[in-house]
């Protein structure tokens, strides 16, 4: 009992991004033998940055929830809204212990994978690690895993996933940030990589979302906070009018005039984005130099993989464009699902904001405005159809009518669920261990090849 309580305490710490990244910063600064004052300042500023970011996200989500409610009421559509938090909260009642163990040892496995393979990425988005650990734990348990085998296999799968997806996104992160210092850690990566790839195909000659040639009297629109406020104001007002005065005032505004409420919520949305951007800037100023010390000691040349808002400051206009076009993709996907007589996946405003905004930034980096729009639209379609394919897997293990919202959960869930149908627990463990061994072998061969080339180069120089 004491061990389980201790483990839950540790997991409660690790799944809070601010504390997790603060600990990494602390270890890194101590490893660099920084002065006590620098260690305290760097650690607290890193934690502060994440708390500011989290506060901005809370403000933003609080303004988006009424928008989703207005949409559902206005168009009277019934279906499933994918939600990570909802399905995890249900699963934890039965699978809490296995989730905690897989998360704790999965983070250790991530460091081991980064240390001994070429996937040099440390995934620092604690809550997404927690959600993925939960999904892996549930699927493996139902597949017949238990005890040490469950924790070992689940942790190794989680560690590999935590290193693989940041590696997949890194080529686009270099385009976005202009450096190779930070990586991307959010389990919607396939949608963002798809957006970046589409941008590279269709965005030739398209100007960046951040390049706006406006008349002098409209120059104020270059301020992203103003342009976001005005754009969202139009959307909120349309939704409020469509939902009706009585519904909005009774359900959301507490009697406040529904149009005034819509305008305030639109500006609150912009305030949430502004706070997130400030938090990200604070984090980046502290975590990159601090992580250098951490990686030098434990995992040479590793990069910190951070949550999706880390890319927002690089293209604030793409954030809004990405959200709008991802949501549009969700609406088109909803229509197509209806025509195909499949389960209706309603476009959740919150997942479409965070994943759509990120897809917009990735698409803009490779294809400008056109890339941001088409790439984010494709992301919207992806996160509409993947949950439909994941539903049978989750339904078979007792989670009907609920599903995960982000792309990587869908792909990993579908893959694991189908492996569990056709392979024994022993075979799945063997497959995962073989994959890890293959990655280690590739790393060793690459190092040997590099060492041989250096020896030959030095020999040639001496001659």
Question: Where in this protein do the model-derived segments appear?
Answer:
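Short juxtamembrane and helix-loop transition motifs at transmembrane-helix boundaries
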Residues: 2-7, 61-66, 81-93, 108-120, ...
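Short, charged low-complexity intrinsically disordered segments located at boundaries
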Residues: 57, 73-75, 97-101, 188-192, ...
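Alpha-helix N-cap/helix-initiation motif
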Residues: 97, 124, 149, 343-347
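Juxtamembrane/transmembrane-helix interface segments of polytopic membrane transporters
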Residues: 62, 66-69, 387, 391-399
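Hydrophobic alpha-helical bundle architecture
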Residues: 115-119, 308-388, 392
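Signature of multi-pass transmembrane helix bundles
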Residues: 2-56, 101, 105, 109-311, ...
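Membrane helical hairpin/interfacial module
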Residues: 42, 49-100
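Mid-membrane cores of alpha-helical transmembrane segments in multi-pass membrane proteins
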Residues: 75-81, 99-107, 126-134, 155-159, ...
């Amino acid at each position: 009992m004491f061990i389980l309580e201790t483990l839950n305490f540790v997991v409660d710490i690790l799944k809070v991004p601010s504390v997790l990244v603060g600990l990494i910063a602390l270890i890194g600064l101590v490893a660099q033998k920084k002065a006590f004052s620098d260690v305290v300042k760097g650690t607290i500023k890193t934690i502060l940055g994440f708390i500011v970011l989290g506060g901005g996200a809370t403000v933003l989500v609080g303004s988006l929830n009424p928008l989703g409610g207005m949409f559902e009421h206005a168009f009277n559509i019934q279906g499933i809204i994918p939600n990570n938090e909802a399905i995890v909260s249900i699963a934890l009642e039965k699978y809490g212990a296995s989730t905690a163990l897989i998360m704790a040892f999965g983070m250790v496995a991530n460091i081991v994978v980064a240390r001994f393979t070429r996937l040099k990425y440390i995934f620092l988005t604690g809550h997404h690690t927690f959600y993925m650990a939960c999904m892996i734990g549930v699927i493996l348990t139902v597949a017949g895993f238990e005890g040490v085998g469950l924790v070992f296999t689940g942790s190794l799968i989680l560690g590999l996933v935590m290193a693989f997806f940041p590696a997949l996104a890194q080529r686009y992160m270099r385009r976005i940030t202009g450096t190779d210092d930070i990586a991307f850690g959010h389990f919607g990566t396939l949608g963002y990589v798809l957006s970046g790839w589409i941008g590279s195909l269709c965005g030739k000659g398209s100007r960046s979302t951040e390049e706006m040639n406006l008349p002098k009297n409209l120059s104020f629109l270059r301020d992203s906070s103003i342009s976001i406020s005005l754009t969202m104001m139009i959307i909120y007002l349309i939704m409020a009018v469509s939902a009706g005065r009585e519904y909005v005032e009774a359900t959301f505004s507490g009697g406040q005039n529904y149009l005034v409420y819509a305008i305030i919520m639109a500006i609150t949305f912009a305030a949430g984005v502004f706070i997130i951007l400030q938090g990200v800037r604070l984090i980046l100023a502290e975590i990159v130099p601090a992580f250098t010390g951490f990686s030098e000691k434990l995992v040479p040349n590793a990069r910190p993989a951070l949550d999706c808002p880390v890319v927002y400051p690089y293209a604030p206009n793409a954030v809004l464009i990405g959200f709008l076009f991802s949501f549009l993709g969700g609406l088109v996907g909803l229509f197509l699902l209806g025509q195909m007589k499949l389960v209706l996946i309603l476009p959740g405003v919150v997942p479409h904001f965070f994943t759509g905004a990120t897809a917009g930034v990735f698409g803009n980096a490779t294809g400008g405005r056109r890339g941001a729009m088409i790439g984010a639209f494709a992301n919207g379609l992806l996160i509409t159809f993947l949950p439909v394919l994941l539903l049978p897997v989750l339904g078979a293990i007792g989670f009907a009518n609920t599903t995960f919202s982000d792309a990587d959960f869908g792909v990993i869930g579908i893959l694991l669920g189908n492996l569990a149908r056709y392979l024994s627990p022993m075979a799945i463990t063997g497959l995962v261990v073989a994959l890890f061994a293959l990655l280690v072998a590739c790393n060793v061969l690459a190092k040997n090849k590099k060492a041989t080339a250096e020896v030959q180069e030095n020999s040639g120089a001496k001659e």
